[in-house]
């Protein structure tokens, strides 16, 4: 009985870890997009600000 509970908890942890791994690339892509877009906005601001 305890072995079944332990196995179930391990499976839940593994599923949570897999979900985290799937989320990480998306988060890094969003941060890259934010930096890229802020750079473009900054360049346009300098270009049109002159």
Curated annotation (Swiss-Prot):
Q: Where expressed (tissue)?
A: Expressed by the skin glands.
**How do biotechnologists make use of this enzyme or protein?**
Attractive candidate as antimicrobial coating agent. When this peptide is covalently grafted to a surface, the adhering bacteria are most probably permeabilized (killed or at least damaged), thus unable to grow.
Q: Tell me where in this chain the PTM Phenylalanine amide is found.
A: 48
InterPro entries given in the database record: Frog_antimicrobial_propeptide
Q: What residue range is the signal peptide?
A: 1-10
Q: Which domain of life is it from?
A: Eukaryota
Per its UniProt record, what Pfam families does this chain match?
A: FSAP_sig_propep
Q: Which GO terms describe its biological process?
A: defense response to bacterium; defense response to fungus; innate immune response; killing of cells of another organism
Q: Which UniProt keywords apply?
A: Amidation, Amphibian defense peptide, Antibiotic, Antimicrobial, Cleavage on pair of basic residues, Cytolysis, Fungicide, Hemolysis, Immunity, Innate immunity, Membrane, Secreted, Signal, Target cell membrane, Target membrane
Q: What is its main location?
A: secreted
- GO CC annotations, alphabetized: extracellular region; membrane; other organism cell membrane
> Where does this one sit in the cell?
Secreted; Target cell membrane
Which residue ranges make up the pro-region? Answer: 11-35
> What's the family?
Belongs to the frog skin active peptide (FSAP) family. Temporin subfamily.
Protein purpose: Amphipathic alpha-helical antimicrobial peptide with highly potent activity against Gram-positive bacteria, and potent activity Gram-negative bacteria and fungi (MIC=2-30 uM). Acts through membranolytic mechanism involving rapid membrane permeabilization and depolarization. Shows a direct extra-cellular antiviral activity probably through degradation of the viral envelope. Also shows a weak indirect antiviral activity by inhibiting virus replication. Also displays anti-trypanosoma and anti-leishmania (prosmastigotes and axenic amastigotes) activity through membranolytic mechanism.
Q: What is this protein called?
A: Temporin-SHa
Q: Which organism is it from?
A: Pelophylax saharicus
């Amino acid at each position: 009985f305890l072995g079944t509970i332990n196995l179930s908890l391990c499976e839940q942890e593994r599923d949570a870890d897999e979900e985290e791994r799937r989320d990480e690339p998306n988060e890094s892509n969003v941060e890259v997009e934010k930096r890229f877009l802020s750079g473009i906005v900054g360049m346009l601001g300098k270009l049109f600000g002159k």
